[in-house]
Amino acid sequence: MGRRPQLRLVKALLLLGLNPVSTSLQDQRCENLSLTSNVSGLQCNASVDLIGTCWPRSPAGQLVVRPCPAFFYGVRYNTTNNGYRECLANGSWAARVNYSECQEILNEEKKSKVHYHVAVIINYLGHCISLVALLVAFVLFLRLRSIRCLRNIIHWNLISAFILRNATWFVVQLTVSPEVHQSNVAWCRLVTAAYNYFHVTNFFWMFGEGCYLHTAIVLTYSTDRLRKWMFVCIGWGVPFPIIVAWAIGKLHYDNEKCWFGKRPGVYTDYIYQGPMILVLLINFIFLFNIVRILMTKLRASTTSETIQYRKAVKATLVLLPLLGITYMLFFVNPGEDEVSRVVFIYFNSFLESFQGFFVSVFYCFLNSEVRSAIRKRWRRWQDKHSIRARVARAMSIPTSPTRVSFHSIKQSTAV
């Protein structure tokens, strides 16, 4: 594949030998480009080759580098790669120009498709692992009633929001085909709205985590005064009118392609993206204040409640940047460089798909209260079954030596 562009250019050079591309106008432009160079001694004069590439005035014995042509004989080339030509020691240009690195955009599109398919596999794998981990965490919070305080209820709801988001992601991937995407049927728009709603709830439940910690640590209010319904309204309630407003905007201004993507000049997606960015920034402010208090006032405190707060803060410190980084990446332009684009695609796919896994690990599997409750349950189960086993063994002995001798005595007496 690497030789194909070079062969195409060589064939073109043979054809162009009969009808040179180089003109006096091109030569003049190339000469003007060389005026800025400060070259002394033996040198190669400015020259335009048969492809149309300008080789500026250069010192003898130097390998000169120029970008590949952008468009040649109906084929687009990647201008981030280079062609090479040697200025010989005698001050003349080498007859051969090395265009071996100049690749057709078509080949790069094929490479992009390969990277896209790998990214899709990473996405499916990550969402599967995340969904399994989230479901396990959900069941643990459901079964372990002994740890059901407000702090863990907030964790539980955050995990539920991620489960629903992961589930709707699979619905989108498995049902919205290119044909459905173009037809813009009502049900696919509802699926998109549901996915975006659960996406927003993730951020608002993370905001609930920040509110709880900020209230308990920075404002030093008793958490007994906080109520579950307040956080339910924040996490599940507030995103609903936001998505309704977004859906109305899409319906009137961008009603196409199942409401995925956006048309140039239409900014309806900012109706829900704006609040997400806002709560993300507020959470960063909360975390700054929380860490400041923990580093100064609560460092010496060793109460169990303070220890739990510290662990919750550590989890939030890890998870909030994860959520923030993945979302802010959508606003980053990876540039034209192929390596940058590939790194961007893989990095974004990994973080986006494994978010749920990280949430379940930090808020459930590494939660000391959850682990302690599981150990207690396990010990109770072992004790219960060991007692049953002892009783069962005692009851399952058919005859003991005492019972045998008594039975024998009874028989002999009867005789």
Curated annotation (Swiss-Prot):
Compartments (UniProt record): Cell membrane; Endosome
UniProt keyword terms in alphabetical order: Cell membrane, Disulfide bond, Endosome, G-protein coupled receptor, Glycoprotein, Membrane, Phosphoprotein, Receptor, Signal, Transducer, Transmembrane, Transmembrane helix
Disulfide bonds, paired cysteine numbers: C30-C54, C44-C87, C68-C102, C188-C258
Extracellular side: 24-111, 175-189, 254-269, 332-338
Oligomeric and partner information: Interacts (via N-terminal extracellular domain) with CRH and UCN. Interacts with DLG1; this inhibits endocytosis of CRHR1 after agonist binding. Heterodimer; heterodimerizes with GPER1.
Similarity section: Belongs to the G-protein coupled receptor 2 family.
Protein name: Corticotropin-releasing factor receptor 1
Organism whose genome encodes this protein: Rattus norvegicus (Rat)
Upper classification of the organism: Eukaryota, Metazoa, Chordata, Craniata, Vertebrata
